């Protein structure tokens, strides 16, 4: 399950280190190329709203295979794109159908008992972190060697392989809700309004993930301009420092099981804020940027585990819908962060980017400070 999550989620992030060369191919400005990343995340958010809730009513393996088929076609379309608009539409469709990890995560949570749910979610999150980091690293290297289109073809091959592995090895799992699709979607609004823990978790992760997108959407612009003037391959390598996120998520899972998700949530927000304080004060010193990237990745990914542990304790029969709502808000925050990051870069460069990230984290911290543990509150 962790491996499947990693390969699938990579599709959402592979374009972040390609933006400079995409802009060059189509003669576009950096801000125009940044729309590729923004619309990918908007598509992912809509997919979480419209598709992920189906995991509560349909057999999940069949649903995942169907999504892989459409995502594969979107990758081919992106690789063949003849204009920036074509590429943007292809990436939007790719984001819309690459919601496979968010169908798998509630399944993994349901297979775990309450005492070990944080640990299980932390293990699955390792795959997500590795997919995010791998996407940036591999896409940067591939772009520097063979061009950005080659990355889409490689990802297409990975999706075909993943479909085969899921068909052969993934467990059959049927949803437990018996609602028509229309009623399923109509149930989302009341569910969101009913659960205060869900709303606060959505705001917390949406804002910290927005700050994450602010940073990683624009760091390529910073590192490929003077005084750095690095290639896209080096930009991808810088993102590799976030491997700390993969190391930290199982640790956070154990902290959640012992001290509660809300405690972990607050610590993650603090780590993210510190990362931007480092980036804004020493952004033109590469070791400081690497440390900032490390702390931000750890904080963002670990916060996701903490928030999901909280919301999955609310209702066993609605886990896909809870996760869908949660991820909608997460990736709307990510899309907002991508847009604001490029906007801030074009006006105030790196200082503006960092201030934008800190404002988003401050908004997320306001939610984290008022959050109590969900249904499996820590009682030790």
Q: Model segments located where?
A:
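Helix-to-loop junctions at the C-terminal end of transmembrane segments
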Residues: 48-59, 248-261, 345
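Helix-loop-helix hairpin linking two adjacent transmembrane segments in secondary transporters
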Residues: 86, 123-168
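Cytoplasmic helix-loop-helix junction between adjacent transmembrane helices
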Residues: 90-127
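Intracellular juxtamembrane helix-capping segments at the cytosolic ends
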Residues: 100-112, 302-315
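C-terminal transmembrane helical hairpin of 12-TM major facilitator-type secondary transporters
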Residues: 262-307
């Amino acid at each position: 399950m962790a491996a499947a999550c990693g390969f699938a989620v990579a599709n959402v992030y592979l374009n972040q280190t390609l933006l400079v060369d995409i802009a060059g191919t189509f003669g576009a400005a950096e801000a125009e190329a940044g729309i590729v990343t923004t619309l990918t995340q908007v598509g992912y958010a809509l997919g979480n709203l419209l598709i992920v809730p189906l995991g509560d009513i349909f057999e999940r393996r069949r649903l995942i295979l169907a999504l892989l088929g459409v995502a594969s076609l979107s990758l081919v379309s992106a690789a063949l794109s003849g204009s920036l608009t074509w590429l943007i539409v292809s990436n939007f469709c790719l984001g819309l159908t690459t919601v496979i990890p968010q169908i798998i995560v509630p399944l993994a949570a349901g297979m775990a008992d309450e005492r070990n749910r944080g640990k299980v979610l932390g293990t699955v999150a390792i795959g997500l972190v590795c997919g995010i980091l791998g996407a940036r690293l591999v896409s940067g290297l591939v772009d520097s060697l063979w061009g950005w289109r080659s990355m889409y073809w490689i990802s297409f091959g990975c999706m075909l392989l993943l479909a085969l592995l899921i068909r052969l090895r993934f467990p059959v799992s049927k949803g437990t809700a018996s609602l028509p699709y229309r009623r399923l979607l109509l149930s989302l609004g009341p569910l969101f309004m009913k659960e205060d823990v869900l709303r606060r978790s959505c705001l917390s992760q949406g804002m910290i993930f927005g700050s994450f997108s602010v940073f990683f959407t624009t760091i390529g612009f910073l590192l490929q301009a003077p005084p750095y003037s690095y290639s896209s391959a080096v930009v991808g390598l810088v993102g590799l420092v976030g491997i700390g996120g993969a190391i930290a998520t199982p640790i956070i899972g154990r902290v959640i099981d012992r001290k509660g998700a809300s405690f972990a949530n607050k610590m993650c927000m603090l780590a993210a804020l510190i990362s931007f304080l480092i980036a804004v004060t020493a952004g033109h010193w590469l070791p400081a940027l690497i440390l900032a990237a490390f702390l931000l990745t750890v904080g963002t990914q670990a916060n996701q585990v903490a928030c999901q542990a909280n919301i999955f304790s609310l209702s066993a029969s609605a886990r896909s819908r809870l996760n869908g709502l949660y991820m909608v808000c997460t990736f709307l925050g990510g899309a907002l962060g991508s847009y604001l990051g490029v906007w801030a870069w074009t006006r105030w460069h790196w200082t503006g980017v960092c201030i934008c990230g800190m404002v988003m984290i401050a908004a997320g911290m306001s939610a984290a400070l008022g959050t109590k543990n969900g249904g499996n509150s820590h009682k030790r």
